[in-house]
């Protein structure tokens, strides 16, 4: 009976550990979802409450930057007629250099591979830029390296099924797989940009 009691005790102990682990995982998932929902509401509130479109979008980029614990968050818009992309909005974390002035008229060919990725995949994440060196256009790689970008998330801005730009997040340290969050935000950004036009 002693051996059987020990086996039952060990089984009970293992079952309790398993149950506690599941509760911990569920709690973490709920906390992450709550943070995500709260941040999304904050983004929508910022865009709808602020009458100044530029100011609203800049504040929105700050909120996104904090959510991803990233270095820089920005919006690029495509000018098809001039075959360039320009950095129209940017937020940089404290101690991180702003690049908006350096990226005003970038030839569209530099991001041609990104546009193809947007068309194929919708959004993408580069976890390690050095591992992508052979797959990226050399000029795009050098441009990102010069800005100390090691990883990034990019989600297209879409109007009438046409890619008109993208939102980028440089060096995200948290939530870096949360494409649905950025995709949701891009919808609200497009609505707000349309009111500016």
Residue ranges and their predicted role:
Residues 46-88, 98, 196:
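Helix-loop-beta substructure at the N-terminus of cytosolic sensory domains
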Residues 74-123:
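GAF sensory/regulatory domain recognition
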Residues 134-135, 170-185, 189-192, 196:
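Regulatory loop-to-helix N-cap segments in sensory/regulatory domains
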Residues 150-158:
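A short, aliphatic-rich beta-strand micro-motif
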Residues 1-18:
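Membrane-embedded alpha-helical segments, specifically the hydrophobic cores
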Residues 157-160, 174-175:
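Sensor-regulatory modules in signal-transduction proteins
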Residues 125-151:
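Signal-transducing coupling segments at domain and membrane junctions
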Residues 17-49, 53, 195:
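Signal-transmission linkers at sensory-effector interfaces
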